[in-house]
Every structure is written in C-alpha cells, then in structure tokens.
Amino acid sequence: MKKVKIPFDIMKEIINDYTLNNISVPQLNKKYHYSNTVLYRELRENNIQIKSFEEASRKYEINKNIFKQITEQSAYWMGFIVTDGSFQKRLNTYQLVIHLSNKDDNHLKKIREFIQPNVKITYTKENSCRIAFTSNEICNDIWKYGIGINKTKEVNLSECLIYNRDFWRGVVDGDGYLGYCEKGNNKHRLEIVGSYSLLSYFVEYCKTIIPNFKNTVKPHKSIYVIHLGGNTAKTILKSLYENSNIYLDRKKEKYEEIIAL
C-alpha cells in the first residue's frame, strides 16, 4: 500500500492548528480527512512533539499554580470542592469536575474565572450545569492538603485549612444550610452535613472563635451533621462571611438577611 503523504501547504496548517490552536488529532482527522495514524506520523516526521493525553484533553492553558499557596480564593474553592467537586480519571489524566444546579451557574463562572476563563460550562436537560478542568498538577496540589480522590470517605485536612475561615465558608456554601426561626431564642441556624472527620475539623475551627463551643457531630442517615443555633450560629456565621470577597451569592444574601435579626 502506498504511503499517504500530506501536502506541504496542508501540513503547515495542521501543525499550526495542533501547536497553536490546540486542536487534537481526532479533531484534525475530521477537519482534514486524514487518519489519526497518518497525522501522528506526519507530525513526528516534522519534529512536532506529540502531546500527552492530559495536554490533548485541555483546550485552554490552565494556571497550574493556583492551589500551590493558600489564599482567600484557593482556600475557599478547596472548601467548595470538598462538598460539590469530584475527581474523574481517564487513562492517566485527572479532571476536577464541579456539578451544580442551573440556579448557581454564576458560581461556576467564578471558579472558571479563577482557574481558566475560557473553559466551557455545559448545561444538561436536568437543570444542572457542569465545568471540568483537566490537570494532574492541580488535582495533586489539592490532594496534598488532605482532600482525597474519594471525598465521601474521611479527609485528613492540613492545619492551614482546619483553621481557615475561607475554607469553611466554601464548605458551608456547598453543604451548609442557613436559616432562622420566627419564634424562640434560637433564631439563627447553621447546619452542615458531611463526613465525620470533616465536621470534627469544623468543631476545631469553631473552638478558635468560641472557646467553650460545645456542639457535637451527630449521625444523619448515611453521613453526619452538626447543628448550630442562636448566638453560636450567629457568631460562627459572622466569622465566615463578614468582609469576605468570594462566596455563593444566595448564601451570602441569606447570611445578610438572618444576621440582621
């Protein structure tokens, strides 16, 4: 069988698409109508380095350094990832995936702005939205702080997160309930669900705000819950949300509403 050779002018376009426009080989296949085998061979013969699966999966360049240091944003988003994020593996490449209700799509736009502003948000027929970032380095950096691949199991948080209000605000925005009762003294309410270890760490954080904090973690169906009420809830909520710069809009609005009571 005669060896297929791509014409020089077309090959220049292919190289440009592959190296500068980050178009994958399967996409080049559809665009130029050459098989993957031919495309890979021609790229190698033109001394073009073949991308890893991670690089090929990433349409846009990601800031890989964002979780290497603890900032208000990085701590907050790790807290939110603990509750509403997941890590998905394909071959040897990991994706950080966040899946929310459509009503919170603006929050996905916030994390997109933080990590990579051009990544696409996808919407489903089930009134949900999703964003995914492909990067082994970002995932590994998050795991180093004690947030595991399987977040439903116990976590082993680094001390820099245990006592970090931005991290816990992210957790509350993800799996917390803020409310109030019209009657009684315990008007303010804060509830968080999660694993036993995660909520135990939250107790440790609360003790730095209220030294005689006595609330305990209790079983709740297949997971655990902690309930805070009255001035305790109000004090902890103020420690989390007051003068903060990153938050889930509707949770911050609820905080402002109940803190005024």
Task: Give the ranges of each region predicted by the language model.
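Internal intein/HINT superfamily modules and their associated LAGLIDADG
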Residues: 1-261
